[in-house]
């Protein structure tokens, strides 16, 4: 037996979720007769990965990337700066997840972890990002040397991440 109840959120939190492209309301599932399992699925075919957070950093997650979390995980939205908001393809608000516990992320297609070593950089198409730690610096760049070739190649803009850290794509 499980009990589901809507988690009450303030109007400002609901508005921020709407701006970030996330759900307005969250549901809390509680086991009524002790420990058990809850199974969940993404609406589209693709991968689901668990990410353990130890409370030492926040995780930035693309729009529609958050699926579920255990207790003690806080889901919020963060405003990006002007250039990242305009050019990232994700808008001015992104999902920020913090706390200690397990977060389940989902994506259309398989999710792969890419470890970027200290001092190295990696260019990733911003349309393929799922999540990255908030401590990893990144920039939004043109995919090619010129604007025309960037737009006509179908790539447009990319994110250049600097290690160390793990990016989920």
Protein language model annotation of sequence segments:
Residues 1-169:
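Composition-driven recognition of glycine/serine/threonine/acidic- and proline-rich low-complexity segments
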């Amino acid at each position: 037996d499980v009990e589901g109840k809507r988690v009450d959120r303030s109007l400002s939190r609901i508005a921020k979720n709407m701006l970030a492209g996330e759900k307005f309301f969250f549901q809390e599932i509680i086991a009524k007769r002790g420990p058990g399992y809850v199974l969940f699925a993404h609406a589209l075919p693709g991968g689901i990965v668990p990410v353990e957070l130890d409370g030492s950093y926040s995780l930035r997650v693309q729009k529609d990337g958050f699926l579920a979390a255990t207790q003690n995980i806080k889901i919020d939205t963060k405003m990006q700066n002007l250039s990242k908001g305009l050019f990232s393809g994700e808008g001015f608000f992104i999902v920020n997840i913090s706390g200690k516990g397990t977060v389940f992320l989902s994506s259309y297609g398989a999710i792969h972890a890419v470890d970027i070593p200290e001092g190295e950089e990696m260019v990733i198409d911003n349309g393929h990002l799922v999540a990255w730690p908030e401590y990893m610096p990144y920039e939004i760049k043109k995919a090619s040397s010129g604007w025309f070739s960037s737009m006509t190649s179908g790539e447009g803009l990319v994110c250049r991440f600097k290690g160390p850290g793990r990016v989920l794509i």
